[in-house]
């Protein structure tokens, strides 16, 4: 997605202090992407839901380390959003966190169904390649915008 869904913090602004300004005390943190997930874990901002694929900028990598995480795997081919992926995302929201969805394929577009199905107090974070970190506070306005994007993709 070329246009960020939320606030874009440039690489040098994406520190813990700036990120905390966009979180509330009880925010349900969701990360999409290995680097974003790793960064939040390093900042001790443990994502309730993490969606990773073990790849960063087309290079294979180890998924971020975190103990006591429930892990679910799902197949999601590049440039697609499968119904299986949507079902797994919905299921993850009903599980005790932290939950990690390990994607075989590509996780990038899963930001969209996450924004639709995330709980009210959610904040979704994902990387904008070569630009920085996108922070999306889930609101009905965001849900409607994302639904319009999904409708265009069908």
From Swiss-Prot:
EC number: 2.7.1.237
Organism annotation: Nitrosopumilus maritimus (strain SCM1)
Keyword Coiled coil assigned: no
Pathway where this protein functions: Cofactor biosynthesis; coenzyme A biosynthesis
GO biological process: coenzyme A biosynthetic process
Name of protein: GTP-dependent dephospho-CoA kinase
UniProt keyword terms in alphabetical order: Coenzyme A biosynthesis, GTP-binding, Kinase, Nucleotide-binding, Transferase
PANTHER family tied to this protein: GTP-DEPENDENT DEPHOSPHO-COA KINASE, UPF0218 PROTEIN TK1697
Summary of the function given for this chain in its UniProt record: Catalyzes the GTP-dependent phosphorylation of the 3'-hydroxyl group of dephosphocoenzyme A to form coenzyme A (CoA).
GO MF annotations, alphabetized: GTP binding; kinase activity
Reaction it catalyzes: 3'-dephospho-CoA + GTP = GDP + CoA + H(+)
Family according to the record: Belongs to the GTP-dependent DPCK family.
Tree of life domain: Archaea
HAMAP family named in the record: Dephospho_CoA_kinase_GTP_dep
Residue numbers binding GTP: 34, 53, 107
Entry annotated with the keyword RNA-binding: no
């Amino acid at each position: 997605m070329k246009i960020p869904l939320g606030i874009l913090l440039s690489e040098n602004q994406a520190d813990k202090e700036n990120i905390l300004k966009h979180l509330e005390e009880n925010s349900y943190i969701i990360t999409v992407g290995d680097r974003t997930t790793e960064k939040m874990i390093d900042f001790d901002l443990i994502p309730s839901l993490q969606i990773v694929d073990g790849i960063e900028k087309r290079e294979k990598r180890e998924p971020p380390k975190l103990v006591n995480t429930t892990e679910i795997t799902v197949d999601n081919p590049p440039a697609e959003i499968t119904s299986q992926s949507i079902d797994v995302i919905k299921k993850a929201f009903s599980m005790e966190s932290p939950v990690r969805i390990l994607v075989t394929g590509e996780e990038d577009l899963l930001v969209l169904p996450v924004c639709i199905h995330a709980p009210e107090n959610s904040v979704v974070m994902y990387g904008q390649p070569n630009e920085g970190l996108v922070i999306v506070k889930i609101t009905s306005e965001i849900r409607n915008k994302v639904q319009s994007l999904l409708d265009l993709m069908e």
